[in-house]
Amino acid sequence: MNDEFSRASEHIWKYFELHAQQRMTVFNFYIAITGLLAAGIGVTLQQGGKYVLFTSLMGVFVAFISFIFWKLDQRVSILIKNAEIALQDLECQFSNEKLRIITKDNSSNLLNLGISSSWTYGKCFRISFVIVGFTGILLAITPFLMKVSTS
């Protein structure tokens, strides 16, 4: 039983660690891509009317990338949650309740209550995806608004 417990805990922990790291890597990649696109949009906006269509296409691409990365994050979040559930099952076997840190964290009622409470990674990431995606849409229509205002 002890050997099986050790193998199970090692397997579950590696699974959790892999997907938690994957989530952070994917988000870092998202930040890098959208940062480069934002810089490109800034340059094309400075050029004026020459690159109106390109600016709009990059804005649409920012919104599209935000949606794709949001969906990727949803999937990884499910995988992490599965690992947390398995880790909680293992923690139930601990006689010392102070060692049940994942169970304690998941039963916390202090997460995501409001602006001043602690937020989960998921909530922070989702807010980022929405804001950047919405900004991409605004940047897609900005050149046309600038064109109308100068006419």
UniProtKB/Swiss-Prot annotation:
Keyword tRNA processing: no
Keywords: Antiviral defense, Cell inner membrane, Cell membrane, Membrane, Transmembrane, Transmembrane helix
Cellular component, GO annotation: plasma membrane
Superkingdom: Bacteria
Regions that span the bilayer: 25-45, 52-72, 127-147
Membrane topology category: Multi-pass membrane protein
Chief location bin: membrane
Localization, UniProt: Cell inner membrane
Keyword Acetylation part of the UniProt annotation: no
Mutant phenotype after disruption: Required for CBASS function; when deleted from a plasmid encoding the whole CBASS locus, CBASS no longer confers resistance to bacteriophage lambda.
GO biological process, one term: defense response to virus
Similarity annotation: Belongs to the Cap19 family.
Function: Membrane protein component of a CBASS (cyclic oligonucleotide-based antiphage signaling system) which provides immunity against bacteriophage. The CD-NTase protein synthesizes cyclic nucleotides in response to infection; these serve as specific second messenger signals. The signals activate a diverse range of effectors, leading to bacterial cell death and thus abortive phage infection. A type III CBASS system. Expression of this CBASS system (Cap17-CapW-CdnC-Cap7-Cap6-Cap18-Cap19) in a susceptible E.coli (strain JP313) confers resistance to bacteriophage lambda cI-.
Name of this protein: CD-NTase-associated protein 19
Native species: Escherichia coli
Gene from which the chain derives: cap19
